[in-house]
Amino acid sequence: MSVDQTLYSRTPTAMADPTCAGPAAFTAAGAFSQPDLMAFSLREEEPIWGFDTIAPSMASWQGKMEQQTFCNPNMERGLKNTHVRNGQPTPPPFDDKKLQTPMGEMYPVAQYAFNSSPPEYAPPKHRSSLSEQSQTDGYGVSTRRRKASAIDQCEQQQEREKREKFLERNRLAASKCRQKKKEHTKLLETRFREVSNKKGELESEIEHLRSEVLNLKNEMLRHAQCGDEAIKIHLAQMVRLITSKDTPNRDLVSPMRSPEQMAASTPHGLSFGFDGPMQLPSEMGSPLDQRRDSEQSIMTESSYTFSTDDSFEELINV
């Protein structure tokens, strides 16, 4: 196989691959002609032109393939000045540094833009989308939390205001209750003082009336010997009342008396549900009979004589 066949058989493959489609390939394909290639012969087993393309699976292969494919940018000039010795090409006889053109002028990068983006950049986009989604989720959660916290603060503020109002009402009610209690206490104190004063006045009036009664009784006793019938009757009633009151008092004053004496001191006129009063023996009731005789003698209308005046005055002053 000749070089011409090798070159034209592999050029479409190199052009078909978009990753290896560079300006050097187009320049080399347009610069070679069939008469120039027939000037020298090459072995078929020694491939000099690196037009074989490999579809890269990673982004790092792109730089390596460009270096291997376009290792000599001045391909046309090199092919014209190359001489083959012992089956291998020799370098050109003159310096290439003077004739080399910069890569930026020969191959402008802006004119050759790839249509499809490499698949290696898809995962970072996915990660960025996940991060953006997490950021949006976090922002939503934070906003919800802020709203919830704001609602809680509003509720707490309302509860605090309600409690303050309730406490204020309680304080007002307590102050009113204390004021009413003070007023009621003052009213009771004034009423107590008034009643106490009234009681004192009444007690003093009672004492004054008692003293007047005693004075009147004494004045009446002074006139007992005047012989007035009304005075004598009134004095007899007074003696009877005094004796009726004095008999139970004597029983209470002498606790050392025997039961027989207590039975003897009971009056004859007691009735325990019978038709007539119960009669006591004469032996036990002899002192009482004597006294009753004396009382009857005093109360008789025929005689109003007294034994002694001193005994009567003692009975009055008891």
Curated annotation (Swiss-Prot):
It is found in: Nucleus. Its main location: nucleus. The lineage of its organism: Eukaryota, Fungi, Dikarya, Ascomycota, Pezizomycotina. Residues 160-199 are annotated as: Basic motif. It comes from Aspergillus oryzae (strain ATCC 42149 / RIB 40) (Yellow koji mold). InterPro entries: bZIP, bZIP_sf, bZIP_transcription_factors. CDD domains: bZIP_ATF2 (cd14687). Coiled coil: none annotated. GO terms for cellular component: nucleus. This is Basic leucine zipper (bZIP) transcription factor atfB.
